[in-house]
């Protein structure tokens, strides 16, 4: 594989947004948000592989399954990384009218209609365990990615079954499992509100909310090992500059009238909110 020269990550993120969402060029705040989210996904690639250049060289021409693709933030970064001869199978069971300010249908159609990245992505709207069980070829892939999707899932038991399904579908293939999730660790005091907001929503999940459970890296690691995966490299990204912390604080405030454990966590959250809310640290892991 020939080494690839990688542009500055900020310039690359801006270029990817220009390719997949050119209308944002006249909207400064949505453009800032989209670029920061893409920068973060590129940083995830760098964390998994040691550098963005190493990620590009490893993924070029490969087939990648992304589980929990949502509106495609990680999908775009993966489509760039696999190049013109690679492929991304992006799986998400959520209804296509889910999501705001852009639904999954709108976001996925927008990416599909972009060139050349859109042609590298196949969207699969079904439960990922069912998808892996029904399509034998789907599991024999090079990499399986779960980026900020575990907290959306219905239970830790389901995550354990998902890890088993991916391991079983991979068979003798040397598939690698790449995980990135909020690590329930705070290195910036301004991120404490994000942690409490996630804990509150996990204690009393919102019907249409993002957070459905609380999961620390140790528990995720144990679920994966019990499913037959072997530990690999782990890295942390400290308090990434994205807006998720503020979004989760806003979502948690809709639980203001609730009781129980969630009420106490909301009080803790409000007590530490002081100015802009930063994000928790992100835990990344590569399993074999």
For the regions a protein language model found, what residue spans apply to each?
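A short, conserved alpha-helix within the catalytic core of class I
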Residues: 153-165
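Conserved class I S-adenosyl-L-methionine
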Residues: 62-70, 176-201
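S-adenosyl-L-methionine
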Residues: 100-134
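Short alpha-helix
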Residues: 211-228
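Conserved SAM-binding loop of SAM-dependent methyltransferases across substrates and taxa
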Residues: 71-84
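C-terminal lobe and adjacent flexible extensions of AdoMet/dcAdoMet transferase-like proteins
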Residues: 244-288
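Class I SAM-dependent methyltransferase Rossmann-like catalytic core
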Residues: 2-56
């Amino acid at each position: 594989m020939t080494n690839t020269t990688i542009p500055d990550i900020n310039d690359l993120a801006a270029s990817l947004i220009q390719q997949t969402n050119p209308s944002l060029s006249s909207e400064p705040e949505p453009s800032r948000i989209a670029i920061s989210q893409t920068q973060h996904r590129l940083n995830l690639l760098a964390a998994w592989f040691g550098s963005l250049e190493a990620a590009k060289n490893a993924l070029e021409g490969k087939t990648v399954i992304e589980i929990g693709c949502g509106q495609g933030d990680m999908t775009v970064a993966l489509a760039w990384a696999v190049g013109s001869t690679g492929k991304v199978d992006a799986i998400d069971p959520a209804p296509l009218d889910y999501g705001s300010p852009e639904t999954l249908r709108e976001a996925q159609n927008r990416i599909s209609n972009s060139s050349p990245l859109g042609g590298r992505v196949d969207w699969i709207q079904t439960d990922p365990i069912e998808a892996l069980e029904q399509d034998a070829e789907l599991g024999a892939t090079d990499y399986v990615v779960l980026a900020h999707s575990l907290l959306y899932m219905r239970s830790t038991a389901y995550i354990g079954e998902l890890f088993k399904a991916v391991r079983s579908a991979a068979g003798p293939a040397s598939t690698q499992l790449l995980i990135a999730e909020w690590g329930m660790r705070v290195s910036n005091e301004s991120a404490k509100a994000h942690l409490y907001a996630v804990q509150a929503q996990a204690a009393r999940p919102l019907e249409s909310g993002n957070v459905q459970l609380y999961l620390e890296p140790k528990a995720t690691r144990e679920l994966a090992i019990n499913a037959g995966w072997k530990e690999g490299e782990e890295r942390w990204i400290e308090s990434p500059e994205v807006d998720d912390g503020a979004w989760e604080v806003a979502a948690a405030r809709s639980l203001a009238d609730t009781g129980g454990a969630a009420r106490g966590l909301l009080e803790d959250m409000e007590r530490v909110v002081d100015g802009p809310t930063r994000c928790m640290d992100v835990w990344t892991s590569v399993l074999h």
